From Swiss-Prot:
Record-listed N6-lactoyllysine modification sites: 10
Positions carrying Phosphothreonine: 121
Protein name (Swiss-Prot/TrEMBL): Histone H2A type 1-H
Compositional bias annotation for Basic residues: 7-19
Organism: Homo sapiens (Human)
Region annotation Disordered: where it falls in the sequence: 1-22
Gene: H2AC12
Modified residues (N6-glutaryllysine): 96, 100, 119-120, 126
Length: 128
């Protein structure tokens, strides 16, 4: 009889995510879904979510690296909002990109105007 089912057929290939194909950690499929549901355009190309996920991943990695350095400088092992604030505000390009962004519990950059600092007086007077 010929009704033996799928014995000799090809096995289905193991599913591979679009994120792994692109070599990314950020979810390409989720970004694609959000682009479609967000009414940004009538149609969304196949490369757009990959590109956007890559950009978001790069920016996140950049901020986290600088924040990790700030945490290490403060002898801490956990990144807190203060470290994110210091990382962003001390980097010229990130500060320009996120200039209007307020980070909760971030504090401010330490800055004292030069005119407010005590004047240096000449301590070594020549003996007459």
């Amino acid at each position: 009889m010929s009704g033996r089912g799928k014995q000799g057929g090809k096995a289905r290939a193991k599913a591979k995510t679009r994120s792994s194909r692109a070599g990314l950690q950020f979810p390409v499929g989720r970004v694609h879904r959000l682009l479609r549901k967000g009414n940004y355009a009538e149609r969304v190309g196949a490369g757009a979510p990959v590109y956007l996920a890559a950009v978001l991943e790069y920016l996140t990695a950049e901020i986290l690296e600088l924040a990790g350095n700030a945490a290490r400088d403060n002898k801490k092992t956990r990144i807190i909002p203060r470290h994110l604030q210091l990382a962003i505000r001390n980097d010229e390009e990130l500060n320009k990109l996120l200039g209007k962004v307020t980070i909760a519990q971030g504090g401010v950059l330490p800055n004292i105007q030069a005119v407010l600092l005590p004047k240096k007086t000449e301590s070594h007077h020549k003996a007459k």
